[in-house]
Regions:
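Divalent-metal-activated hydrolytic enzyme cores
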Residues: 1-21, 53-77, 88-199
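Glycine/charged-rich beta-loop-alpha catalytic/anionic-binding loops adjacent to active sites
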Residues: 43-54
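Short beta-strand segments
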Residues: 26-28, 50, 80-84, 164-169
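N-terminal short beta-loop-beta anion/metal-coordinating cradle
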Residues: 4-45
Length: 199
């Protein structure tokens, strides 16, 4: 921030007047996955919502409030759902042990895991199996986001809004685009995520 102030002494005064971020980031609470640092964004460039395992749950009023504000007030053009390899929430959902109150939160992932269990268990390498389910969870959350009434209404109104699924490698610092992007109602119907039964 010292460098920023040396280049623009009024940076924070300008920043305090308004925010016009072009994107909403929905990511994991993991302290090693900070949105701004991962994408090289400055303060004011990203609206952020984080929770364990980057979940989009239709009864989560916190997430829905963030989504509504970012889409309808800030008019973001992109929403990125970014999970990460090695996600503890996803790993807990794949197991049988109780981890406390979080069991209620990861129930949604656990249900998805049961649905895909046969396919997942065909992957013999444990790390590859875990990584694949992390990716599937992100795709599920992208679909969950795309079918919210907030996003559906924005598209119906002709608002430019794209939803993307990314995964971050803790051990590499690299982001992988999972090639799941929705821009319209038709994108949902035509997507392999929807056809795989992630709905």
């Amino acid at each position: 921030m010292i460098l920023v102030l040396s280049q623009d002494p009024d940076f924070f005064k300008k920043l305090s007047k308004t925010q016009t971020p072009p994107l909403l980031w929905i990511g994991c609470s993991d302290s090693r996955v900070p949105a701004n640092e991962i994408i090289g964004a400055a303060p004011g460039e990203v609206f952020v919502h984080r929770n364990i395992a980057n979940m989009v749950i239709h009864s989560d009023m916190n997430m829905l409030s963030v989504l509504d504000y970012s889409v309808n007030i800030l008019k973001v053009k992109h929403i990125i759902v970014c999970g990460h390899y090695g996600c503890g929430g996803v790993k807990a959902a794949m197991g049988n042990s109780s981890v406390g109150i979080i069991d209620n939160w990861i129930r949604h992932i656990k249900d998805s895991y049961k649905f895909r269990k046969k396919e997942i268990e065909e992957i013999s390498n444990e790390k590859e199996r875990f990584d694949k389910f992390v990716e599937w969870n992100i795709k599920q959350q992208v679909l969950n986001l795309a079918v919210t009434s907030i996003v559906q209404q924005a598209w119906a109104n002709g608002q430019e809004l794209s939803i993307h699924g990314w995964v971050y490698g803790l051990d590499t610092g690299l982001v992988k685009d999972l090639d799941v992007t929705f821009r319209t109602h038709d994108d949902i119907r035509n997507s392999s995520v929807y056809k795989l039964g992630f709905n």
